[in-house]
C-alpha cells in the first residue's frame, strides 16, 4: 500500500509543560504533507520528524486558540529564510487572516512566496481541499469558540491490472484505462472477457479523522463511521467530568465512546491537560471502553 502516515508533533493542551509540545500533527499521503494545527514549537518538531519542509503546502487550523496556531508565524518566517517560493495555503475558521496579516506585513514583508488564506464555516460539513488522491472535509465540533475537526479521506483507486492475463488476451494498451475502471474486454472475435479475470481489487481507501477541541458530541459519530484512525481529544479523566463540560472538552472515556459507536479501527487520544504527569489513567479509562486505544506522544508515527 502507498504511504499514508500520521506524525504527532505535539499532543499537549493550552498550558505549556516540559513533557509535551502544543497540538500539531502532519498527515503524509504519498509524500504530500498536510499540517493540522500549528501550536508553539511545531517547526522544531517538524525538523525532528525529518519530514521535508518543501512538501508542506497546506495547513489546516481547527480553531483560533493559541495552542493551536501560535506556531504559524515562526513557521512562515522560517519558510522565508529557507528560500521558499511555493505558495502556502492556510485553511481556517474566519478571523485568522485578519489576525496574521499585520504581523506578516511587519515581520515577513520580504517573503518570496504567497501565503493564501482559505476561510470556512465551522458549522458546516464541507470539502475544504481536494486533489486526485484525497479530500479533506470539515467535522463540526462544539467548543468555546468556532471549531471543527478534519476528515482526510483517500479516494478509491482503479483496479489493478493482472499483467499475465492482459498479455494472454493480447489486450491493447488503449483499453487498459477502461478495464482498470471496471469495463469488460471484448476481443476482436467478439468474446467477452470479464473484468474480474483481468483485474484484482485495489486496496480499500483509508480515512483519518482529527477531532479537537470539543465537548462530548455524539452527532459526529455518523461522519466518523468506519474510519481507520481517529484522533480525539481526551483532555481530562472521568473524575474531571464537570471541568470537561465547563471548558468544552472531552474525557478519555467519552472519546472512546465516540470511537466505539463510530466503529473506527484505532483510536489515538491526546490534547492532555497539564495536570497529568502520567497519562496512564487516561489510557486505562479509554481502553476500558474501546480496547484498541493508544496515547499520542511526540514523534509518534502511525501508518494507516
Curated annotation (Swiss-Prot):
This is Ribonuclease Z. The active site is at 67 (proton acceptor). SUPFAM superfamilies: Metallo-hydrolase/oxidoreductase. Zn(2+) 1 binds at residues 63, 65, 143, 213. Zinc phosphodiesterase, which displays some tRNA 3'-processing endonuclease activity. Probably involved in tRNA maturation, by removing a 3'-trailer from precursor tRNA. Pfam families: Lactamase_B_2 (PF12706). Keywords: Endonuclease, Hydrolase, Metal-binding, Nuclease, tRNA processing, Zinc. Binds 2 Zn(2+) ions. PANTHER family: ZINC PHOSPHODIESTERASE ELAC PROTEIN 1. Belongs to the RNase Z family. Its cofactor is Zn(2+). The keyword DNA-binding does not apply. GO terms for molecular function: 3'-tRNA processing endoribonuclease activity; zinc ion binding. Its EC number is 3.1.26.11. InterPro entries: Metallo-B-lactamas, RibonucZ/Hydroxyglut_hydro, RNase_Z/BN. It catalyses: Endonucleolytic cleavage of RNA, removing extra 3' nucleotides from tRNA precursor, generating 3' termini of tRNAs. A 3'-hydroxy group is left at the tRNA terminus and a 5'-phosphoryl group is left at the trailer molecule. Homodimer.
